Amino acid sequence: TYRDIPASEILAGSHLSNLRQLVEEKLHKKWVKLVDIRHREIKDKKNNPQHAQIHIFEYDASNGKEYFLTFEDREDRTIFSLLRLRLPGKDNHEIYEVLPELKDAAIIREIHTFWDQLSVGEKWSIFWQHLGFWKQLIETSEKIAKENGYNKMAVIAWVWVRWYYEKRWYHLEWEYMVKSL
């Protein structure tokens, strides 16, 4: 699916509202395999998630470090689940003045498990839930944070998943679920 912006809402630059689709079609015609996250999501592929392996990618970003953790199929790199971990630089004083709950905290910016979308009224299989991707990604990110000298983890969590973090010793501080490491 494409998340188009209506052409009437584009104020400057190209007024093509389906630019991603056009670029993808052009690359497809040239037999270029797309390997961005959107094209590697499980979607309707038949990969077996029980064959997934964890992968950890580390890179420098904006006066800190980022870690991108994924559970991927070892054959074709299909992504079943991902987590983005931010280790802010220790000298980000202006951020800590505004958000003191983030002082000395590593931050889970995103965590997501992909599966097929369901039709209205269709039952969701609990199979995915029991694979434990989230639990393993969170535990791995906590270990990375601790090894890098952070003494707490903060998670930007939707209200309806806060119970999940509470079961893992997180508590609410302002808008973040926070845990001492």
What label would you give each PLM region?
Residues 1-105, 109, 127-129:
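C-terminal scaffold of the Radical SAM
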Residues 89, 114-117, 161:
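Feature marks short, surface-exposed loop/turn motifs that line or immediately flank catalytic pockets
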Residues 105, 151-154, 176:
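Beta-sheet entry/capping signal
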Residues 111-129:
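A short, internal acetyl-CoA/4′-phosphopantetheine-binding micro-motif in the GNAT/acyltransferase core
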Residues 113-117, 142-146, 169-170:
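Hydrophobic alpha-helix feature that most strongly marks membrane-spanning transmembrane helices
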Residues 124-145:
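Conserved acetyl-CoA-binding loop-helix of GNAT-fold acetyltransferases
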Residues 143-157:
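Conserved GNAT acetyl-CoA-binding A-motif
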Residues 156-181:
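Active-site/acyl-donor-binding loops of N-acyltransferases
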